[in-house]
């Protein structure tokens, strides 16, 4: 058995390093089906980076830098992108993957090369679910920010648009995640701090998604 925390940490580091190397070294021609997803993932990363930079500039007197915020992964225990998107070259017969999806479908066995198409589908579905979770969070937060009399900051339609475009390109049918609502009076200071936290986390996930798409496109 592999300890869950150690596996997740190692898997994350190995995945990002491997996918970065694969993207830099690969000279393969983009496939017609994957290319739109790669294009959309690049737009996603650009929008995530620009939105975070803009937020840090506007909220310069708030704790909004990477060193100041409390990092949070809102997809934790909901999706398994890191595990599902591990390159098959790194998955050996003796490897252990403690994810809900793989343990159920492979019935506890370790993954083999015949699982290539299945693992790709699982990876892309997990990415879709990540985007869906962030989409709901951002829309909920934007609704609160638009209530702020100061109108200091709110999310523009660009980042929400590129999230939707990549989700459409992935084309998975999934249950609609209900948008959160609250009857409480919003605390705009806390909302802006949470915006910073989510934008930092989303940019990290956008980096992962872009590298995964680059790797899959070149495979």
From Swiss-Prot:
Q: Which GO terms describe its molecular function?
A: cytokine activity; growth factor activity; interleukin-12 receptor binding
**Record's SUPFAM superfamilies?**
4-helical cytokines
- The residue range of the signal peptide is 1-22
Question: What parts of the sequence cross the membrane?
Answer: none
Primary location group: secreted
GO biological process, any: immune response
Its annotated function is as follows:
Heterodimerizes with IL12B to form the IL-12 cytokine or with EBI3/IL27B to form the IL-35 cytokine. IL-12 is primarily produced by professional antigen-presenting cells (APCs) such as B-cells and dendritic cells (DCs) as well as macrophages and granulocytes and regulates T-cell and natural killer-cell responses, induces the production of interferon-gamma (IFN-gamma), favors the differentiation of T-helper 1 (Th1) cells and is an important link between innate resistance and adaptive immunity.
| Name under which the protein is recorded | Interleukin-12 subunit alpha
**What broad taxonomic lineage does this protein's source fall under?**
Eukaryota, Metazoa, Chordata, Craniata, Vertebrata
Q: What gene is this protein a product of?
A: IL12A
């Amino acid at each position: 058995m592999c300890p869950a925390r150690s596996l997740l940490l190692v898997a994350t580091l190995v995945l990002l390093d491997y996918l970065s190397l694969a993207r830099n070294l690969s000279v393969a021609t983009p496939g017609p089906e994957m290319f739109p997803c790669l294009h959309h993932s690049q737009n996603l990363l650009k929008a995530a980076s620009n939105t975070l930079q803009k937020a840090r500039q506007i909220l310069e007197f708030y704790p909004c830098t990477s060193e100041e915020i409390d990092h949070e992964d809102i997809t934790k225990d909901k999706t398994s992108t890191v595990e599902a998107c591990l390159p098959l070259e790194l998955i050996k017969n003796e490897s252990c993957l403690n994810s809900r999806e793989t343990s159920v479908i492979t019935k506890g066995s370790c993954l083999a090369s015949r699982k290539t198409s299945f693992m790709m589908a699982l990876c892309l579905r997990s990415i879709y679910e990540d985007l869906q979770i962030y989409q709901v969070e951002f829309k909920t937060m934007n609704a609160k920010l638009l209530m702020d009399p100061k109108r200091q900051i709110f999310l523009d339609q660009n980042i929400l648009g590129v999230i939707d475009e990549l989700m459409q390109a992935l084309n998975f049918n999934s249950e609609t995640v209900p948008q959160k609502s609250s009857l409480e009076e919003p605390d705009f200071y806390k909302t802006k701090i949470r915006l910073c936290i989510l934008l930092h986390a989303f940019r990290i996930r956008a980096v992962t998604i872009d590298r995964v798409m680059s790797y899959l496109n070149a495979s």
